A protein has these predicted regions:
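A conserved hydrophobic position in a structured secondary element of the catalytic/binding core
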Residues: 6-7, 41, 78, 115
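Short, well-structured N-terminal submotif of metal-dependent ribonuclease cores
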Residues: 1-40, 54-61, 134-141
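A generic structural signal for short hydrophobic patches within well-formed alpha-helices
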Residues: 11-12, 46, 83, 120, ...
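Short, flexible helix/strand-to-coil boundary loops that buttress conserved ligand/catalytic motifs
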Residues: 15, 87-90, 124
Length: 141
């Protein structure tokens, strides 16, 4: 079973029904819910989601969405090593560097799902959009 870090843009696509991306993003969350894949988020992703969703919804509603999300995903830890690796990386976006090294620090993460492929070009992990990941799973069957 694949262990996948899901970037915040993918989660937002699903939660905000951002077409056309929401189709595949919703499939990814469904796969997490059914146990087909293990989806992981970081505390930074939860913080970003709260901040962005709070702009359009009340605190209680946002917290409820995040509670639903945490039921179907797991949280990667971030520690000093993750921050130091991110600080010394070649990533131009520090937040993406944090996500990347949180996934690498947890050695069994297989890949990162994001729509911002260019932001992760320096990653050692496989980087996929939700669409290409779903297509690659279908071709393996």
């Amino acid at each position: 079973m694949d262990k996948i870090l899901i970037d915040s843009d993918v989660i937002l696509d699903a939660l905000l029904d951002r077409k056309p991306f929401s189709v595949h993003a919703t499939q990814i969350l469904s796969m997490c819910e059914t146990g087909e894949i293990n989806g992981y988020l970081t505390p930074v992703i939860y913080s970003n989601l709260y901040y962005l969703l709070r702009r359009i919804a009340k605190h209680e509603k946002v917290i409820e969405k995040l509670k639903q999300l945490i039921k179907i995903t797991k949280v990667l830890t971030m520690d000093q090593q993750v921050v130091e690796n991110a600080l010394h990386s070649g990533f131009l976006d520090f937040e993406d560097a944090l996500q990347n090294y949180a996934a690498i620090n947890r050695s069994n993460i297989d890949l990162i799902l994001t729509r911002n492929l260019k932001d992760y070009k320096n990653s050692e992990l496989g980087i996929f959009t939700p669409e290409t990941y779903i297509k690659s799973r279908k071709s393996k069957r």
